[in-house]
């Protein structure tokens, strides 16, 4: 089965009433709770809806709103061993993309306290924590976070080999 068919079949099993998918997690999102919506919107369901609620309300409001919970203990789309929720989405929807695998390693390192998994993980953690200080509105933070993850994915696809140093290329030795 090709990837679009697999994704469609999986979405129908998760959301039998049809329409756009709806996902719910804890409020005040950081790494995984921004990375997962980015992944869903870019690779799984561009019309997906995301709800952020107090931790103790995730399951009840998920049932009430027909939303699938993610990134909380005890649900399918969550951490499993050393893997984070982002990994669970990639595995469940069988997404295969070299750049996405690189992004997943960075997200996993930042989200699980293992920054040595990828040099970029510490930077992603710093940016995520900074964004959370700048935005009180979870959906506003999500919108900014989508840009961050778009940039990270573009880097992983096209620019991960690019290096910067001094002096700039083409200037030779600077006296």
Describe the predicted segments one by one.
Residues 1-5:
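N-terminal acidic, proline/glycine-rich, low-complexity intrinsically disordered segments
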Residues 6-41, 45-48, 54-57, 73, ...:
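Non-catalytic regulatory/linker segments of enzymes
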Residues 17-115:
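Polyanion-binding interface signature
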């Amino acid at each position: 089965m090709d990837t679009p068919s697999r994704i469609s079949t999986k979405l129908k099993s998760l959301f039998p009433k049809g329409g756009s998918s709806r996902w719910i997690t804890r409020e005040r999102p950081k790494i995984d709770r921004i990375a997962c919506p980015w992944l869903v919107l870019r690779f799984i369901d561009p019309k997906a809806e995301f709800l952020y609620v107090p931790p103790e309300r995730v399951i009840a409001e998920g049932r009430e709103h027909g939303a699938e919970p993610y990134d909380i203990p005890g649900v399918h789309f969550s951490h499993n061993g050393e893997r984070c929720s982002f990994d669970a989405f990639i595995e469940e929807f069988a997404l295969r993309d070299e750049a996405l695998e690189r992004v997943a390693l960075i997200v996993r390192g930042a989200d699980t306290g293992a920054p040595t998994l990828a040099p970029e993980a510490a930077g992603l953690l710093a940016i995520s924590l900074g964004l959370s200080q700048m935005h009180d509105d979870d959906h506003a933070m999500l919108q900014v976070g989508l840009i961050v993850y778009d940039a990270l994915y573009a880097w992983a696809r096209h620019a991960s080999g690019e290096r910067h140093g001094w002096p700039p290329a083409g200037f030779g030795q600077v006296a």
